[in-house]
Amino acid sequence: VTLLTRVDCHACERAVVDVSRICGELNVRWSVSDVDSDRSLRAEYGDRVPVILVDGEEHGYWEVEEERLRAALTG
């Protein structure tokens, strides 16, 4: 799981907490990337952070849908 965020994004801060908890409970590795540190990430995802990527594919954005994320990580 990769969580795309940016500095001073309150929704991103909430997403970090949620993704950290969910991935921790499921023993799934995850990371955070700042969209503003990479031009291609900013161009593709910059208007809808936070964005959750699962196996490199966009899973969701703006908020963490816990049940849906859990299903993707356990199914």
Spell out what each predicted region is.
Residues 4, 33, 61:
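Small/polar loops that bind or transfer phosphate-bearing groups
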Residues 28-39:
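Thiol-based oxidoreductase modules, predominantly thioredoxin-like and allied folds used
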Residues 42-44:
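Short glycine-biased active-site loop of nucleotidyltransferases that positions the nucleotide triphosphate
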Residues 46-52:
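Structural micro-motif
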Residues 54-75:
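Non-catalytic, surface beta->alpha helical segment in thiol-disulfide oxidoreductase systems
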